[in-house]
């Protein structure tokens, strides 16, 4: 979709990544997906009188892993706040999140644009918070129920600067975040199960305007395709309103993929509407330099550096290097093949060609591959 002449778009994404811990962020309840409604919500998740939250240390490790991998600053003093609002799936009447002291500050993600060039998208912050429950509509005709299994599930909310200029860049950025999170194994990235959700903040302005336009936030997009479509339709809506001499209001919207439109849910809230204040039941969490350094030392070789190594050390093409480094387990398998074969190009052809084709045919991942790296490497050699 071409942006009309004389207009420019500014997009910032908020990505909600469910951290793949076995228990919730402030309680010992299980995070296992697909269980019967309300079977995994304990008294802490429900906010019952007299209960106190306690922090799951694993969420800090995973958040620091992500922050270090994007070159961010890790906030050694991490605090939690209450975000107050009413919604049926929020039994406490507030969400525990991080407002003033997020665990991750800054950082950047490099994406490939449609014309083949690289572009840096700045990350503003990433903070820890708890998820809410969810509504189940028409479980009985005319009724809506509440399932609180998801309440208290740990989330890492990753907020970008408005550096994204079109829907294609937004999808490229979202895919890069998805790849990194799954590569680090801090999130399973399963969008069908709600493990990764996108909120898109979109505004348009005249080409010669310096100030950002009035933005709308489109909530809870759960696929790359819906993200792209929602941005296209919202951009068209905003430009048509302004072209007709109308005025835009800052609001929160939902995307209807069947009607190909975005619809207003409510006027956009500001921070004062949520009445943030420090969470009185949780002390500040102090991360030592040793803790951060230990995580840094344990970080795997990241996809970009791995692809670069494949190109320089093994003379693979950029496309082969990117494919073999996009999945951590696939890259590990290929590296092990190379310990038994000195012919990297032939090994790459076998792995990305026949091997992956057969695995896909039988719906198997690389970790379930019946052919060992040693066997394949020795055969190639």
Q: Which residues are covered by each model-predicted region?
A:
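N-terminal, positively charged regions that mediate nucleic acid binding
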Residues: 1-78, 83-85, 143, 164, ...
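SsDNA-processing nucleotidyl-transfer enzymes
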Residues: 65, 69-151
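Short, surface-exposed linear segments at secondary-structure transitions and domain or protein termini
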Residues: 36-38, 130-135, 222-230
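Hydrophobic (often cysteine-bearing) scaffold residues that line and stabilize catalytic clefts
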Residues: 55-60, 95-101, 170-173, 227, ...
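Short acidic, glycine-rich loop/turn motifs
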Residues: 19, 110-118, 204-208
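Short acidic, Gly/Pro-enriched loop/turn segments at secondary-structure junctions
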Residues: 21-29, 134-137, 208-211
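Charged, compositionally biased, marginally structured helical/coil segments
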Residues: 2-10, 48-50, 146-163, 168-381
